[in-house]
């Protein structure tokens, strides 16, 4: 997993509350067991005017001109600004996969569904919680200022607006450590690789009948 320390990027505003995981990545695209290939179908039912199908050539599909991610001013956005209860619905891990592959490094919202919140951290996507008042102000500023960018500092736990105002956010210490060091579940396990190998060696020596060479 790629480490997250600091990020400065363009903000895209998704002004909808209770965005569920089926809206983030519709169910018909969940057949793949790989974690790649979901970015083109992020918010599929909102981004396109037709009904998307797995393995379809998305470059030929008609775009919805009213959807925010299709607006020219938000092309290349890497910070998603959202409303409350983002990521509600089913527990599909494909949702943070799709967001990350599209290009988002962080999400800012007043609240998240618990499972989506946890899955995001495990996949290197930083879900930041700010107050509704701060989020409201960000929506207004993004709308009024094309090219609006934010600076995120995970170590300092801050979001800095273009006007210099600093917004602080809370994060669990263990999750922060994992993001700063790029550690997912596999990475955490590999930190104990030497101890695991030692146990396996001792176990094999003490109970050799359990093993087939």
Curated annotation (Swiss-Prot):
Catalytic activity line of the entry: (2R,3S)-3-isopropylmalate = (2S)-2-isopropylmalate
GO terms assigned for molecular function: 3-isopropylmalate dehydratase activity
Principal EC category: lyase
Keyword terms of this UniProt record: Amino-acid biosynthesis, Branched-chain amino acid biosynthesis, Leucine biosynthesis, Lyase
Pathway(s) annotated for this protein in UniProt: Amino-acid biosynthesis; L-leucine biosynthesis; L-leucine from 3-methyl-2-oxobutanoate: step 2/4
EC number in record: 4.2.1.33
GO CC, alphabetical: 3-isopropylmalate dehydratase complex
GO-annotated biological processes: L-leucine biosynthetic process
Any Pfam family: Aconitase_C
Family, as annotated: Belongs to the LeuD family. LeuD type 1 subfamily.
Complex and partners: Heterodimer of LeuC and LeuD.
Main function: Catalyzes the isomerization between 2-isopropylmalate and 3-isopropylmalate, via the formation of 2-isopropylmaleate.
Protein name: 3-isopropylmalate dehydratase small subunit
């Amino acid at each position: 997993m790629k480490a997250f320390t600091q990020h400065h990027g363009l903000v895209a505003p998704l002004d909808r509350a209770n965005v569920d995981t089926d809206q983030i990545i519709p169910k018909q695209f969940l057949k793949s067991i790989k974690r790649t290939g979901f970015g083109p179908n992020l918010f599929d039912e909102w981004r396109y005017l037709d009904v998307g199908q797995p393995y379809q050539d998305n470059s030929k599909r008609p775009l919805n001109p009213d959807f925010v991610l299709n607006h020219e001013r938000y092309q290349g956005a890497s910070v998603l600004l959202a409303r409350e209860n983002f990521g509600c619905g089913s527990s599909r891990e494909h949702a943070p996969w799709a967001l990350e592959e599209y290009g988002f490094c962080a999400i800012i919202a007043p609240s998240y569904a618990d499972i989506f919140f946890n899955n995001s951290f495990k996949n290197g996507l930083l879900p930041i919680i700010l107050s509704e008042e701060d989020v409201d102000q960000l929506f207004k500023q993004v709308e009024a200022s094309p090219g609006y960018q934010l600076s995120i500092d995970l170590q300092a736990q801050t979001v800095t607006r273009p006007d210099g105002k600093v917004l602080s956010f809370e994060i669990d210490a263990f999750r922060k450590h994992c993001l700063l060091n790029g550690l997912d579940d596999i990475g955490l396990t590999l930190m104990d690789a030497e101890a695991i190998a030692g146990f396996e060696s001792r176990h094999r020596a003490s109970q050799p009948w359990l093993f087939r060479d």
